[in-house]
């Protein structure tokens, strides 16, 4: 199965359209969203083409392919416009001999086992790190 992973869209219809286009180009089967989908947050500037309703509509058009965890800017109000669950702090996804542990990453950490892969958002910096389990 092919996955596309995204986080911290913060209501940017512009970047959400790019995400959907890339998802379709990749012919992925699952879109893993790591939170902060609609609201920009009080400390962040408005993102490019900020439109929570358009962003929600784009994401809802892919709802059957989405697995999502909640971010620190996501709220109960978001659940009223999004047609897929966004309330879990973690998601556990078995992939072959490994387990993907999905979280936004802002305040809660799952217990990882040897070979698990932690996938998180929140920091607005793309990175890949290989570490031991502590």
What are these regions, as identified by a protein language model?
Residues 84-85, 94-101, 106-134:
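Conserved beta-sheet core of the metallophosphoesterase superfamily
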Residues 2-95:
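Core catalytic region of metal-dependent phosphoesterases/phosphodiesterases
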